[in-house]
Amino acid sequence: MEETTLLRLENVDICREENVILHNASFVLKNGEFVYVIGKVGSGKSSLLKSLYCEIPIMNGDAFLMEYNLCKIKRKEIPYLRRKLGIVFQDFQLLTDRSVIKNLEFVLKATGWKNKEQIAERIDNVLVQVGMQNKGYKMPHELSGGEQQRIVIARALLNDPKLILADEPTGNLDPETSGQILQLLHDISRRGTSVVMTTHNYTLVHN
């Protein structure tokens, strides 16, 4: 791939069991680019993102993400690919039994961070990036939906990913909060991180 190209899909088929979800799909994503994947509910948007972090296989065509060939990637390589990605889920998937800081600390320790000072510094850094520096000791249930989504984005930023995959990140939020989350993702993209965001909300994208 060209040096500025982060992701290239060419004529790929994405299947779940024997069902073809997407057929003959192609697109290119460059470093620092923000791309919307827009479509109706059930049109395969989430499956496309899942194929990029190797939860769903790509059956045909060519697919390259960074230095990885997604059609031929080995199982042992998948964790290393995923560490270079930040994933933002619509339903947050925060650990409800621990604080924001402990949620973020859990991810860092799971991905190999050991130094307590470096862990604390990194958590402070990402919370500032998403405007949640005063919420670190809150439990998830004490946060609004928009605040929880900001924490999810902070979690996605922890390992300084080259690409953020945001799956309907505004799907459960009111219009004003959705606009704020969208602005935050654009700010992150302007700092050099590529973003692929799925949505069924044409109005949100148009605005």
Segments and roles (model prediction):
Residues I164-D167:
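Catalytic Walker B motif of ABC-type/P-loop ATPase nucleotide-binding domains
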Residues R98-F106:
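Short coil-to-helix segment of the ABC ATPase nucleotide-binding domain corresponding to the Q-loop/switch region
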Residues M139-L143, E147-Q149:
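Conserved ABC ATPase signature
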Residues Y53:
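Helix-to-loop junction immediately C-terminal to a conserved catalytic motif
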Residues L158-K162:
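A short, proline-enriched helix->beta-strand linker immediately N-terminal to the Walker B motif
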Residues P175-T177:
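Helix N-cap at the start of a conserved alpha-helix in ABC-type nucleotide-binding domains
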Residues G61-N69:
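Conserved ABC transporter NBD signature motif
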